[in-house]
A protein has these predicted regions:
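...captures the hydrophobic TM-helix bundle architecture rather than a specific catalytic motif
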Residues: 1-311
Length: 311
């Protein structure tokens, strides 16, 4: 009976105990706390564990990257050990789809914040929320309507001032970044089709070019931030701009790292035309990053262009 039970086929495998979920959660907490302290005090504040906002954020973010690499290592070992049966692969796909769906909702929140501020910059809301005693002003203050008028000057984008020198020209560097990401989406698709056709050389070159384009996009975004005519603090435009584009930039960095892992796996002879979910998941994620940028470019850079910054 024991031998029969041992030889029984199972569609699922029991994963070994792993420290990465707990470690990753701790690092995510440190990143969130560090980001909050950093944004509220722009580098000051009391911090946590002797670290101020930027330091705490950096420790947490580096911890997240380390967790990703180590967790990917373990998953790759499971795949090479034959643990990823067709049923397991199917549910890995479901998991990746749900993860991307949650990321979509994450960016919906930032688009919501941006459009709420841009459509009602003067603090006038179409819904007059009143209490039984008619305390309209108090209610407006609770939802941020009163302060918004002071922060935006009643205009979106804010008019040029000492703290706001203008927005970016969407047909300059933002357009270049758009072309870079669209090209990277093409090259990662080329790599995928090359893999399906057994073209290992095309797979490697497609991945390498995509990684280079991802790094180039990040460099251009960093240059744009350095030369921005406004800062994060002081007005809603800067806050929503840097949060939306900044989180997208973080996703580009993560996606580039994801593809880099796939590139080194391809060099090591991993992936076959029939079994390559690791690369497929990275390609899905990269296409998601592309689509989000198209919405950011259209909504924030083009529609919300306002007065372009004079260089």
């Amino acid at each position: 009976m024991a031998e029969a039970h041992a030889e029984k086929h199972h569609d699922y495998h029991l994963v070994n105990p792993s420290p990465w979920p707990v470690f990753g959660a701790i690092c995510a907490f440190l990143t969130a706390v560090g980001g909050i302290v950093w944004m509220r005090s722009m580098g000051g504040g009391e911090g946590l564990f002797g670290l101020r906002g930027p330091g705490l954020f950096a420790v947490g973010f580096l911890g997240i990257l380390f967790t990703m690499l180590m967790w990917w290592r373990d998953v790759i070992k499971e795949a090479h050990g034959g643990d990823h049966t067709p049923v397991v692969q199917l549910h890995l796909r479901y998991g990746m789809i749900l993860f991307i769906a949650s990321e979509v909702m994450f960016f919906v929140a930032w688009f919501w914040a941006y459009f709420d501020a841009s459509l009602f910059p003067a603090g006038i809301h179409p819904l007059e929320i009143t209490t039984p005693d008619g305390a309209t002003e108090a209610t407006k203050q609770m939802i941020g309507m009163v302060e918004r008028n002071a922060l935006t000057g009643g205009h979106w984008p804010p008019k040029p001032s000492a703290n706001f020198h203008g927005t970016f020209d969407p047909w300059g560097l933002p357009l270049v970044n758009t072309l870079i990401l669209l090209t990277s989406g093409t090259t990662v698709t080329w790599a995928h089709h090359a893999l399906l056709q057994g073209d290992r050389r095309g797979l490697k070159w497609g991945l390498l070019i995509t990684i280079v384009l991802g790094v180039l996009f990040t460099a251009c975004q960093a240059y744009e931030y350095v030369h921005a005519g406004f800062k994060y603090a002081g007005h809603i435009y800067g806050a929503t701009f840097f949060m939306a584009t900044g989180f997208h930039g973080a996703h580009v960095i993560i996606g580039t790292l994801f593809l880099t892992v796939c590139f080194f796996r391809a060099l090591a002879g991993h992936f076959t035309p029939k079994q390559h979910f690791g690369f497929e998941a990275a390609a899905w994620y990269w296409h998601f990053v592309d689509v989000v940028w198209l919405f950011l470019f259209a909504c924030i850079y083009v529609i919300g262009a306002g007065t372009p910054l004079a260089h």
